[in-house]
């Protein structure tokens, strides 16, 4: 089997909503795909003093633990990209929602056994990004 080819290392959608509303929509979309919300934090949390965080860069962490176990059985290196993360950024007046492109993982790890799992996760990420920016 050959390793999946993919177009871009990241998936990006532009949101028509303010960043706070977009983050709320990402959280709702995560629940809609049966993932568990782990935490929400600013990108710089822990690197700056409390109260000084940049709220224009927010990471939403989530996981589907059943899927996680399946993926780790195929290739434990997948753990490097866990938990799943969706990043919401406000820059130059625009709000963007982004994540890694899971189709790249089979290529990065040179493991064709990951193809089906990466394709499934790609669909999940696309669904989250699209649902949160509708």
Predicted regions mapped to residue ranges:
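Terminal, regulation- and interaction-focused segments at domain boundaries
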Residues: 2-39, 134
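Short glycine-/small-residue-rich flexible loop motifs, especially phosphate/cofactor-binding loops
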Residues: 27, 44, 126
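Small-molecule pocket liners
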Residues: 9, 58, 95
